[in-house]
Amino acid sequence: MNDYRFETLQLHVGQENPDPATDARAVPIYATTSYVFKNSAHAAARFGLSDAGNIYGRLTNSTQDVLEQRIAALEGGIAALALASGAAAISYTLEALGQNRGHFVAQKTIYGGSYNLLAHTLPNFGITATFVNIHDLAEVEAAIRENTRAIYIETLGNPNSDIPDIDALAALAHKHGLPLVVDNTFGTPYLIRPIEHGADIVVHSATKFLGGHGTTLGGVIVDSGKFDWEASGKYPAVAAPNPSYHGVAFVKAAGPAAFVTYIRAILLRDTGATISPFAAFLLLQGIETLSLRLERHAENTRKVVEFLAGHPQVEKVNHPSLPDHPDHALYQKYFPKGGASIFTFEIKGGQAEAHKFIDSLKIFSLLANVADVKSLVIHPATTTHSQLEEKELGNQGIRQNTIRLSIGTEHIDDILADLQNGFDAVRA
């Protein structure tokens, strides 16, 4: 199946044939908590991981399984684990890697929730992080310690769409025996596949572009299957016999899919951030049109960026497609199809002007989500990043006049007219 092109894979992987029980062509919603074993030996084999398949609804579900297969194929990974939210996917990944007082080197311009997790929540459990200018490889390397467990980046930083050099960071991580973890929520596998550039683990908030319609929470961890968990001795949770799973070493039981298998069998088992079958179904509906939506998002974004860049009431547009953006060359390298539909601009003035602009929009919805088919807007400094101190906001490139846009798929003339109405209201 993987020989097919992206547009075909997004429709068929995981259900190449109709449902064998009902001949249904659409993926069924399997609303069940449990699964009947054929006999006692079959049950024991499932629990011992020697026979892959459903055990209990907290761990696996047949609708969820199709979603996992499909996203793994689209990202070029060996396996995936779908979870209840993007926050769960990121948390489980970092907890699995960082246990026993681990440390991360992280891009400093990342989603506010991920920043708070690394800067404030995980340190309560002995896991720490150093935030770096991800474009300065010397600074990144200098931040690596004996207990560092991974380098963590986003393909497109939230909210300013800054772009790391994934190839270079993967080489640096591997030089030190570390995995590179990449959040590809804003990139999507249609625009960029981080595993092809050396990433070892990819995470998503599937709530965003993968689902695409603002209806469903979900998260995904994709395992490249390429990282050697045994080589450094730093990852006993994955490589060593696990006392809470009758001595199973996941690298032996699951082979190259050891990382996501460990998270499913241990962290998901014990803490239960399970995706519902209905949520998995809705995300699958979104993925079926991913390429079509992303093309329209990219086209509309290009025209909005041009409009804002030439507007007299705009102080600055933070979009990597612009030649004067510091990551323009990286944008051309990693995003030949375009993209970066979530970005910020700075309106002339301050917080009052930003709020008046936002409150005057009609088509753009003021809400915390992004990557919806509907156009969205928010003021990061007083909402999504409001937990950050002023210095932290500055480090993230956020000012009081910063406005974040998420460009939808409406007609471009209506989008531009709505933005102009906002500017007119500020000037009035």
Question: Where are these predicted regions, by residue range?
Answer:
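Conserved N-terminal alpha-helix of the aminotransferase class I/II PLP-enzyme fold
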Residues: 39-91, 113-120
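N-terminal "arm"/small-domain region of PLP-dependent enzymes with the aminotransferase-like
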Residues: 1-61, 69-70, 403
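Short hydrophobic/aromatic beta-strand micro-patches
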Residues: 222, 344-346, 406-408
